[in-house]
């Protein structure tokens, strides 16, 4: 089994024909956040992905296998939510509340895209946004989520999400098993000196 252990820097220019001939490694967002992964190329070949920890692959990245061969990364279609709004203020509020939950978001022209989550869909609808479930590649804003790891930075995160889920359950008459256990017990002040590099302009 070949091992893929290197990603070519985005600023390195490769011949388009060379990249086009490379086999594709099609992965969903969660899989692209893993530095250690057993995967299958689109050709059917099984490979081992062994990249530096914290690596988050993006659609179009070019990788190098241990035999020197190139492999190109493709973002797989997956279940997502497309969020639109009748005005900029509503869409901004939607982005703000998603940011408060440290939810990975792909920002488009007049549209937000996030991984499918019925609880968040219900919350966004209540905010006045239009939410559509779709199947599409998902490539959220880079650099804000620590390689795809999502957690709360204060003790209210789990309570906030649990409350939203409770409202959803009561409204729809069923429950979900999803839980979040990464919230911290310490106070965390977000301000100009905060060095976590989060997006959405909140904290």
Curated annotation (Swiss-Prot):
It comes from the Bacteria. Its main location: cytoplasm. GO terms for cellular component: cytoplasm. One of its GO terms (molecular function) is nickel cation binding. Pfam families: UreE_C (PF05194), UreE_N (PF02814). Belongs to the UreE family. Involved in urease metallocenter assembly. Binds nickel. Probably functions as a nickel donor during metallocenter assembly. NCBIfam families: PRK13261.1-1, PRK13263.1. This is Urease accessory protein UreE. It comes from Burkholderia pseudomallei (strain 1710b). The gene is ureE.
């Amino acid at each position: 089994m070949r091992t893929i252990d290197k990603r070519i820097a985005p600023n390195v220019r490769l011949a388009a024909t060379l990249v086009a001939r490379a086999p594709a490694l099609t992965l969903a967002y969660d899989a692209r956040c893993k530095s250690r992964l057993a995967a299958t190329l689109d050709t059917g070949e099984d490979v081992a992905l062994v990249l530096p920890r914290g690596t988050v692959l993006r659609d179009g990245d070019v990788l190098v296998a241990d035999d020197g061969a190139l492999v190109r990364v493709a973002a797989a279609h997956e279940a997502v939510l497309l969020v639109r709004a009748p005005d900029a203020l509503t869409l901004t509020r939607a982005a703000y509340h998603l940011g408060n939950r440290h939810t990975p978001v792909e920002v488009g022209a007049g549209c937000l895209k996030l991984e499918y989550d019925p609880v968040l869909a219900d919350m966004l609808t209540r905010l006045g946004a239009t939410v559509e479930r779709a199947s599409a590649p998902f490539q959220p804003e880079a650099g804000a989520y620590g390689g795809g790891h999502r957690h709360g930075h204060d003790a209210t995160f789990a309570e906030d999400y649990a409350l939203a889920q409770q409202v959803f359950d009561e409204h729809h008459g069923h429950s979900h098993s999803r839980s979040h256990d990464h919230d911290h017990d310490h106070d965390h002040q977000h301000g100009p000196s905060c060095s976590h590099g989060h997006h959405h302009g909140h904290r």
